[in-house]
Every structure is written in structure tokens, then in C-alpha cells.
Curated annotation (Swiss-Prot):
This is D-amino acid dehydrogenase. GO terms for biological process: D-alanine catabolic process. It comes from Rhizobium johnstonii (strain DSM 114642 / LMG 32736 / 3841). Pathway: Amino-acid degradation; D-alanine degradation; NH(3) and pyruvate from D-alanine: step 1/1. Its EC number is 1.4.99.-.
Length: 416
């Protein structure tokens, strides 16, 4: 089957690779000159199969009010007269109940665990190296209240059979020895030992090369204008260069997916939530992390990537803007230097990307009302984590096969 994949980020490239392996004739279209040059370029680097939770959670509305007045706030809201923003925020708030949180977290963990298996298989199959480490994620608590509040996450992990360990201060230091220098600043943590780390940009570029070897064509520097639909079936894609025909199209355009789908009457509740990162060369390894540490107070991930530290986080709701706010850089610098001052901040590179967030935290994967048109988008902060499992699902669904896990509640139909 002739398939076009729209988007050459981690989700699009893994989808293309999986489809090519299944024997399809695949073309990837992206406006950038190469793969992984937008949201996949410098994300936090965590592959969080266990540390995987919806942002919409009980207590978040009250926390959000407090965050708005913090100097180093994990949430930044720049409200505007944007109906898409207002609708998305209202839907997210409706998911901030214990019942919805449990449902959403369970399906996120299901897809994440499936992705863990898929990534291990892909790594063994291709031999790709991407500064990977398989040492787990430590959710680090600075207060007793944070430690006690983690009980709901522990309950969800236990219910889904995901390994975890609740650590006291000394346990955190055993996992991350550099924390011994700041032991008075922490009270404990939640360790998910099956989590991994790795450079998403390196991985995506290496996999794109493997996909090309399988016959996948990459149309870089190509702007997507519209989907070509006739009589309720997708016929291809219209770009600034040509009309490209296909029997199936997979939309993996992240935050830009809703803009392409809207003219077809497909209302996809995905909205951009900007995140920021610093990439810092290590100057003193004894004060650098070994794996990924999530600073719960500031919702910032601090990750070891080879001889670098990647610091990523924050949620800025400001629409389709990619400017670099210096106040956001200050927050990242504060968190990492407070816990792991082993990097040379003077040589750090600063970046931002638009995460495609759904109001319930779960990506949208599956068919649409237009025959032959499939979605693989809305992964939020977990595109790297969920990419390989999502790609397997798309490979099965496009080919008319039966997915290995239940994917029905990942489809757009869950929004009514």
C-alpha cells in the first residue's frame, strides 16, 4: 500500500519505519530540512515508561493558581481570545477528577509499557546508539507533602504491574550519588527502575537512515497545504511542490495536526504547550546525575545524556509561539544548579518546543471518519516515550491487522 506519513519527528519516523517493515511504500513529508528538528530536537531525554501521568489530575486547578504567582513556576499561562485554547483548557479541567485520572493514567501506562517492549526490540534489531541509559527515573520530593501525595501514583503503578520503589533520603542518594551534596534539600523519591534515557534527536536521525535503507522516501523542505479528500476517502496530500497520491495518510504533525484536520470537520483537541530545555556540558561528573531525576517542585527533568546534562520542563500555554523566554531559562538553571551543579552553565544551549497536548494526556492513535486517514499525534511530553509502541499500533491499524494491545480508547472517537 502507498502510505504518506506527515511529520518527520520521532512519532512520524518510527511510524514510517514500522510501515516500511510491513511492506508498505512509504513517503515522509516535513517542512524542515531534516528529521527531528522541531519538538523532537532537544526534549528532556527521558523515556518514562513508569513515570507517566496525565497533567490533568486531582488538585491541579488549585496548584495551578499557586504556580501562577511563583518566581520559578512550572506553569505559565498567557491567556488570549483563542477558542481552541479556551476549549482545551475547559476539557482539561474536566479531567481533573480522581475517576478520570485513574482511567487516563491506566491507558497511558498500557501504551508506555508496550512502547518499552517495542523500543527494546527496535534497539536489538537496529543497533542504534543514542546516549541511552537503562537506569530508571527518580521522582524527587523536596517536601513530605509531595512524598505523601505520590500515593495515588504508587496505586496506579501497582494496579498496572509497573515496577516501582518508594525511597527515603538515603535511598535517593544510593540511586543518584551526587545528591549527597544536597541531602538536606530532599526527603525522598519514587523510583521507576524500568525507565530509560536517551537523545531523541540522535535516535530519530539514525532510525530515519534505517528507514531510507528500507525504501522510505523523505520529502524534506516541503510545506503541507491540505489533505486531498474525495468522496469520504483520502487520496493524498497537496504540498507547495506537488500533489502526492496515496492510499493511506498518517498525520503525525504534533501541535499542527488540528490545523490540517479542521477543514475536514475533524475536531482534534490537541493544543501546543511550550516546553523549554537547556543542554549543558558536564564539568564535574561527581555532581552530575547518572540517569533522570524529576524535580517534583518545579516539574523539571534533569537527565544524563553522555557527557551532557539535559534539563527540560515547564508548561507554557501561549499558543503557537516559539520565542525563548529568559525567565524560563532562569528556572531551568535554578533547578539544575540547586541539585546537580556539575555542568558548565556558561556553555549551555537554550531551546523551546511545542508539545502537542490532549486534555486527558493520552495521545490520539487510530482511524478517522475519512477512510484511509489515520492519526498518530497528541503525545504531549511523552512522544519519545510512546513513539515505538504508537508506531506498532499504526502499522497494525493501517494494514488492517489486529493490534497487540487494546487501542480502541486511544482513537479520536473517545471525544465524542
Amino acid at each position: 500500500m502507498k502510505v504518506i506519513v506527515l511529520g518527520a519527528g520521532i512519532v512520524g519516523v518510527t511510524s514510517a519505519y514500522q510501515l516500511a517493515k510491513a511492506g508498505h511504500d512509504v513517503t515522509v513529508v516535513d517542512r524542515q530540512p531534516g528529521p527531528a528538528l522541531e519538538t523532537s530536537f532537544a526534549n528532556a531525554g527521558e523515556v518514562s515508561f513508569g513515570y507517566c501521568s496525565p497533567w490533568a489530575a486531582p488538585g491541579i486547578p488549585m496548584k495551578a493558581m499557586k504556580w501562577l504567582f511563583m518566581k520559578h513556576a512550572p506553569l505559565i499561562l498567557r491567556p488570549k481570545l483563542d477558542m481552541a485554547m479556551l476549549s482545551w483548557m475547559a476539557r482539561m479541567l474536566s479531567n481533573c477528577t480522581s475517576e478520570r485520572y485513574a482511567i487516563n493514567k491506566s491507558r497511558m501506562l498500557r501504551l508506555a509499557d508496550y512502547s518499552r517492549i517495542a523500543l527494546a526490540d527496535l534497539r536489538a534489531e537496529t543497533g542504534i546508539a543514542y546516549d541511552e541509559r537503562m537506569q530508571g527515573t527518580l521522582q524527587l520530593f523536596r517536601t513530605q507533602q509531595q512524598l505523601e501525595a505520590s500515593a495515588k501514583d504508587v496505586k496506579a503503578l501497582a494496579a498496572d504491574g509497573i515496577p516501582y520503589e518508594v525511597l527515603d533520603r538515603d535511598g535517593c542518594i544510593r540511586f543518584e550519588p551526587a545528591l549527597k551534596h544536597v541531602r538536606d534539600k530532599i526527603v525522598g523519591g519514587l523510583l521507576t527502575p524500568k525507565d530509560e534515557t536517551g537523545d531523541c534527536f540522535k535516535f530519530t536521525n539514525a532510525l530515519a537512515a534505517k528507514a531510507e535503507a528500507l525504501g522510505v522516501r523523505f520529502a524534506y523542505g516541503t510545506t503541507i497545504k491540505a489533505l486531498d479528500v474525495e468522496a469520504g476517502r483520502v487520496r493524498g496530500v497537496i504540498t507547495d511542490r506537488e500533489r502526492m497520491s496515496a492510499e493511506a495518510v498518517v498525520v503525525a504533525l504534533g501541535s499542527y495536526s488540528p490545523l490540517l484536520l479542521k477543514p475536514l470537520g475533524i475536531r482534534l483537541p490537541v493544543y501546543p504547550v511550550k516546553g523549554y530545555s537547556l543542554t549543558i556540558p558536564i564539568a564535574d561528573a561527581s555532581r552530575a546525575p547518572e540517569s533522570t531525576v524529576m524535580d517534583e517542585t518545579y516539574k523539571i527533568a534533569i537527565t544524563r545524556l553522555g557527557d551532557r546534562i539535559r534539563v527540560g520542563g515547564m508548561a507554557e500555554i501561549s499558543g503557537y509561539t516559539n520565542d525563548l523566554g529568559l525567565a524560563r531559562r532562569s528556572t531551568l538553571e535554578y533547578s539544575v544548579t540547586d541539585l546537580f551543579p556539575g555542568g558548565d552553565i556558561s556553555k549551555a544551549s537554550f531551546w523551546s518546543g511545542l508539545r502537542p497536548m490532549t486534555p486527558d494526556g493520552t495521545p490520539v492513535i487510530g482511524p478517522t471518519k475519512v477512510a484511509g486517514l489515520f492519526l498518530n499525534t497528541g503525545h504531549g511530553t511523552l512522544g519519545w516515550t510512546m513513539s515505538t509502541g504508537s508506531a506498532r499500533l499504526i502499522g497494525d491499524l493501517v494494514g488492517g491487522g489486529q493490534p497487540e494491545i487494546d487501542a480502541r480508547d486511544l482513537a479520536i472517537t473517545r471525544y465524542g
